[in-house]
Amino acid sequence: MGLYNITYKNKETEKEINAEMGKPFGLIEKLKLGGIGSRRMIIENFSEDIKNLTLKVSGIQYANIELRPNGIIVHINQGIYTHAWTIPYFRLSVFNGDFFTIHGGGSHIQFNKEKSWKENKEFLQKIVK
């Protein structure tokens, strides 16, 4: 599990993410799965360790999720910066309560369940499978 700054393309960071999560799915796999990415979701809260590593940006923060062969990547958009949080499937826990929460390796991120929940419900069921 790692948190990477992917605002600018960096081949070393890309290699690390691919080694940890597996290479991105090819076109045929993407079609078979019915898509590998969520729509953007509104972030409600982070765990403290993610808050410390990411920027302090006021206003609404968004994230989307990408499926990979060995785990998921949560792309966190904060202003002009983008961070990628990699979570292997064996460390992934998903909770559905007042908020939709993803836990991995002792960290978590909470998403608002308003509009984005309805738009992403089908995709989020793929993660649970």
Residue positions per predicted region:
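Acidic, Ser/Thr- and proline-rich intrinsically disordered linker/docking segments
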Residues: 2-47, 54-56, 91-129
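Phosphoinositide-binding peripheral membrane targeting modules
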Residues: 56-95
